[in-house]
């Protein structure tokens, strides 16, 4: 290919004739599932999405049992509701590290990415909602000479 190009004109014609890589392609495994990883704080979630009845399983438990607080359940369902796909996909997630809030955010991030891998047309909706963006906020480290990350020790004049 490269050896046959002798001038700039030929390079221009070759560039026009070459097809661009397809952007919207499903990424599925052998069982027809879309796989993605989501992260938030110290939590890492591995998420599989496949067509089904809307069952969501987190660490081999129903998500209502694993995330008992309604706020965490709502966080988990946000990408599904935003894309109008409630009850259409079965979701299996394994999550480790961090606390419950970070884990819920990690699963949400993983669900969003897996939905875009399964159905690439949802990317614009989920991107607009901010579900595909990794939340990079992590705990600030403690500094020496300080009680915590920013809090100073109590000051005494005398």
From Swiss-Prot:
Gene3D superfamilies linked: 3.30.230.10
Keywords from the named record: Ribonucleoprotein, Ribosomal protein
GO biological process: translation
InterPro entries from the UniProt entry: Ribosomal_Su5_D2-typ_SF, Ribosomal_uS9, Ribosomal_uS9_bac/plastid, Ribosomal_uS9_CS, Ribsml_uS5_D2-typ_fold_subgr
A Pfam family recorded for this sequence: Ribosomal_S9
MF terms in GO: RNA binding; structural constituent of ribosome
GO CC entries: cytosolic small ribosomal subunit
Family: Belongs to the universal ribosomal protein uS9 family.
Name of this chain's protein: Small ribosomal subunit protein uS9
Native source organism of the sequence: Brucella melitensis biotype 2 (strain ATCC 23457)
């Amino acid at each position: 290919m490269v050896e046959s190009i002798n001038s700039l004109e030929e390079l221009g014609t070759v560039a026009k004739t070459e097809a661009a890589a397809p952007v919207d392609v499903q990424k599925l495994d052998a069982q027809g599932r879309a796989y993605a990883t989501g992260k938030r704080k110290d939590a890492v979630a591995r998420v599989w999405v496949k067509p089904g009845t809307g069952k969501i399983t987190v660490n081999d438990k129903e998500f209502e049992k694993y995330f008992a607080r309604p706020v965490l359940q709502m966080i988990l369902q946000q990408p599904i509701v935003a894309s109008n796909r409630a009850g259409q996909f079965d979701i299996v997630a394994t999550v480790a590290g961090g606390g419950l809030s970070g884990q819920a955010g990690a699963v949400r991030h993983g669900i969003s990415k897996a939905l875009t891998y399964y159905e690439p047309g949802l990317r614009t909706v989920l991107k607009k909602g901010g579900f595909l963006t990794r939340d990079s906020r992590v705990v600030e480290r403690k500094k020496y000479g300080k009680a915590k990350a920013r809090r100073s020790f109590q000051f005494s004049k005398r």
